[in-house]
Amino acid sequence: MAKHLKFIARTVMVQEGNVEGAYRTLNRILTMDGLIEDIKRRRYYEKPCRRRQRESYETCRRIYNMEMARKINFLMRKNRADPWQGC
């Protein structure tokens, strides 16, 4: 039962027989939650050393993306007089 509890909150209602739209909505929800990627990854056995490498890479990528987003947000602030000074 514990394996199925995570699927309780992913119920999508089919409105007016629109099965394709409901399927797209469900697929988007599962992708945003990371479940599709997790299921694909667990399809085959992953050696412990490869798992550590993957988790380390994902951590580095997450840190890089957060820092890059912070720098871009700093550069794109609207309260500066002229964001393109000297051009």
UniProtKB/Swiss-Prot annotation:
One of its GO terms (molecular function) is structural constituent of ribosome. It is found in: Mitochondrion. Keywords: Mitochondrion, Ribonucleoprotein, Ribosomal protein. It comes from the Eukaryota. GO terms for biological process: mitochondrial translation. Signal peptide: none annotated. Gene3D superfamilies: Ribosomal protein S8 (1.20.5.1150). Transmembrane segments: none annotated. Coiled coil: none annotated. GO terms for cellular component: mitochondrial inner membrane; mitochondrial small ribosomal subunit. Its main location: mitochondrion. InterPro entries: Ribosomal_bS21, Ribosomal_bS21_sf. Pfam families: Ribosomal_S21 (PF01165). PANTHER family: MITOCHONDRIAL 28S RIBOSOMAL PROTEIN S21, SMALL RIBOSOMAL SUBUNIT PROTEIN BS21M. NCBIfam families: S21p (TIGR00030). Belongs to the bacterial ribosomal protein bS21 family. Component of the mitochondrial ribosome small subunit (28S) which comprises a 12S rRNA and about 30 distinct proteins. This is Small ribosomal subunit protein bS21m.
